Swiss-Prot record:
Gene name of the record: mre11
Family affiliation: Belongs to the MRE11/RAD32 family.
Species: Thermotoga maritima (strain ATCC 43589 / DSM 3109 / JCM 10099 / NBRC 100826 / MSB8)
Keyword rRNA processing: no
Name recorded for this polypeptide: DNA double-strand break repair protein Mre11
NCBIfam families named in the record: sbcd (TIGR00619)
Length: 385
């Protein structure tokens, strides 16, 4: 017997098909890594026998001129997903301006896919006949923002959200909100998306929906439990600001009268790692070569002082994709923002110098503490001599 009170969903987002990373230093086409991740997502959808697949934007990386290869891959994976369950696609800020025409073409050859290009609700039928009302909030058209001042644009967005709340009440079986924007408080997690942000207060997400599927933020985030609101994150680590991000898709189970349940699907992306050094000396060169030799992903080197020794490391090491010189202040800022991620690198940045700076900023009697620290360092140096 078909259970219309149950809905199994696979939610994925931010594929960025066609992306090439580190174009200014060592361009790396990420196609094969993305395809492996997408293969895993499709396999999980098949294995879990999902009823509906939600794609919340930025499927393509180039907004103006996606490659033929990227469009071919997009069509291929959409077709594979449609064989598993009906698919609903919401556009994002990166998505190609011609996506609407592309969507018209795809929907002309299959009724198992829906492209929601506006703020108007859409009713779809899931795999087992469940009636699902989709409440879409696509990334707003830039022309709309330009026609309005900031206050008017904010009112425009909030009025759309209020209307979607009213529309959610008209659901038959399930109501799902789909949005591509930044939830207030998460702007720092936008990764490569940083810039002009559409920021929405989470309280404005219609509370009567059964699930809120979001896209745009590249790391997994459970925003709230009522309604369950999730960013699944992108499938791969596109740049080094995403080193510690959890990547993948989300499997969601909805049952009428019960709280929703979900499970992360890890896409197993290649790792990224930043190595920090005070200066590139012979010891640092050995450390870089040794680390890169055994590291399965891509590496960035950041150093503070120019020592005059900087051979063609990128020509020598295939997975070293970026070498940057940064000021002490820039490096300290990174360490403050992600202390757990980079704590093992502190010794390469002259730990005691950083600690002295910390004392100056945080301790009123820092002069006395600095004197004690210097005395300890002198004793250590004498014992090592």
């Amino acid at each position: 017997m078909i259970n219309l009170k149950e809905l199994k969903i696979l939610h994925t987002s931010d594929w960025h098909l066609g992306v090439t990373s580190w174009t200014s230093s060592r361009p790396v086409d990420r196609r094969e890594e993305l395809k492996k991740a997408l293969d895993k997502v499709v396999e999980e959808a098949e294995k879990r026998e999902v009823d509906l697949i939600l794609l919340t934007g930025d499927l393509l990386h180039s907004r103006n001129n996606p490659s033929v290869v990227a469009l071919h891959d997009l069509l291929d994976y959409l077709k594979r997903m449609m064989r598993t369950a009906p698919v609903v696609v919401l556009p994002g800020n990166h998505d190609w301006k011609g996506l609407k025409l592309f969507g018209n073409f795809v929907t002309s050859i299959s009724s198992d896919i829906t492209f929601v290009m506006s703020f108007e609700p859409v009713d779809v039928e899931a795999k087992r006949g469940q009636k699902v009302r989709i409440l879409p909030f696509p990334y707003p058209d830039e022309s709309e923002a330009l026609r309005k001042n900031e206050g008017d644009f904010r009112f425009f967005l909030e009025s759309r959200l209020n209307k979607l709340y009213e529309e959610a009440l008209k659901k038959e079986d399930f109501a799902i909100f789909m949005g591509h924007f930044t939830v207030e408080g998460l702007a720092g997690y936008a990764g490569i998306e940083q810039g002009r942000e559409i920021i929405i207060n989470r309280a404005l997400i219609p509370s009567v929906v059964d699930y809120a599927a979001l896209g745009h933020i590249h790391s997994f985030r459970e925003i709230q439990k009522q309604p369950l609101t999730i960013y699944p994150g992108s499938l791969i680590r596109i740049d080094f600001g995403e080193e510690a991000d959890e990547k993948g898709a989300v499997f969601v189970e909805l049952k009428r009268g019960e709280p929703p349940r979900y499970e992360r699907i890890d896409a197993s992306p290649l790792p990224l790692k930043t190595l920090y050094y005070k200066k590139i000396d012979t010891s640092a060169l050995k450390s870089i070569r040794d680390f890169c030799r055994n590291f399965p992903g891509y590496v960035r080197v950041v150093y503070e002082e120019d020592s005059g020794i900087l051979p063609d490391l990128m020509g020598e090491i295939d997975n070293l994709v970026k070498i940057e010189r940064k000021s002490r202040r820039e490096i300290e800022e990174v360490l403050r923002e992600s202390p757990e991620e980079f704590k093992e690198e502190l010794d390469k940045l002259d730990y005691f110098e950083l600690f002295k700076e910390y004392l100056k900023k945080r301790e009123e009697n820092h002069e006395k503490l600095l004197k004690i620290l210097d005395e300890l360092l002198d004793e250590v140096k004498k014992s090592e001599a």
